[in-house]
């Protein structure tokens, strides 16, 4: 698995795993029907959102690897390198949404895609769903899949883009819930940040190096810059 595959199109991704391509720029894939589930490392040229329903594979991206629990959502931005490794003896049951940046260009979703900062979270910052949340995510995916099976007409793109946007809005809501339910961990991270900031200022580093970046502190407490920034905004208002 040393070679990194460059997967620029959804059609090429589908061919790798044996999925049917219903639309060149959007796809909903179900890994329990995949013809191939080997071990891969790849850089994808499109957005992807995966709902893991079993612990049947390991996913590595960013700086960390993670054996995802059931009912976990992983969101990956274009250009990230992702590794898939099957876990022997455990069947993979997961469903994924793939959509190319070209598809959302000129849409409401295209104009707001950057607000979905969870696309740049680390693997261990994935979204863990309740049963009710899982049902909502699956319902959104089913609606997108239904549109992909429908004959293309003048409404197709708008309906698909709207349902993708709805799914991402739900993910944002669920992440905000996760920040609340993990408050103890979040407060610990913020306390470490405050100590690091005090040290940075008291030891004269600021005078030499200038004001630190979000990435500087995020790296120190082992969080992605986007997750750390969202955490600070959530806790401080």
Can you say where each PLM-predicted feature lies in the sequence?
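Short beta-strand His + acidic residue motifs that chelate non-heme Fe in jelly-roll/DSBH
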Residues: 58-60, 82-89
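A structure-centric signal for secondary-structure junctions around beta-strands
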Residues: 25, 46, 91-93, 161, ...
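Basic/polar phosphate-binding segments, predominantly the helix-turn-helix DNA-binding elements
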Residues: 211-237
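A hydrophobic/aromatic-rich effector-binding and dimerization subdomain
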Residues: 87-152
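Conserved metal-binding segment of the jelly-roll/cupin
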Residues: 68-82, 98-101
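An amphipathic alpha-helical interaction segment
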Residues: 135-198
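Short helix->loop/beta-hairpin flanking segments within DNA-binding domains
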Residues: 195-210
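Generic protein-terminus/edge-of-domain signal
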Residues: 1-67
């Amino acid at each position: 698995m040393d070679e990194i595959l460059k997967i620029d199109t959804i059609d090429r991704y589908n061919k790798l795993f044996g999925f049917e391509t219903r639309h060149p720029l959007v796809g909903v894939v179900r890994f329990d029907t995949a013809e191939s589930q080997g071990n891969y490392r790849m850089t994808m040229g499109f957005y992807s959102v995966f709902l893991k329903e079993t612990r049947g594979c390991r996913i590595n991206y960013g700086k960390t690897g993670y054996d995802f629990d059931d009912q976990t959502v992983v969101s990956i931005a274009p250009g990230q390198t992702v590794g898939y490794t099957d876990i022997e003896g455990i069947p993979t049951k997961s469903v994924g949404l793939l959509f190319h940046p070209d598809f959302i260009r000129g849409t409401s979703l295209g104009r707001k895609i950057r607000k979905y900062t969870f696309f740049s979270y680390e693997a261990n910052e994935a979204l863990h769903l309740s049963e009710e949340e899982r049902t909502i995510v699956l319902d959104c995916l089913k609606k997108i899949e239904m549109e992909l099976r429908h004959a293309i007409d003048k409404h197709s793109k708008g309906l698909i883009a709207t349902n993708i946007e709805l799914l991402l809005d739900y993910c944002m809501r669920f992440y905000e819930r996760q920040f609340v339910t993990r408050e103890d961990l979040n407060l610990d991270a913020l306390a470490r940040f405050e100590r690091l900031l005090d040290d940075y200022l008291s030891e004269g580093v600021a005078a030499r190096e200038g004001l630190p970046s979000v990435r500087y502190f995020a790296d120190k407490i082992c969080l992605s810059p986007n997750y750390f920034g969202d955490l600070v905004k959530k806790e401080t208002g």
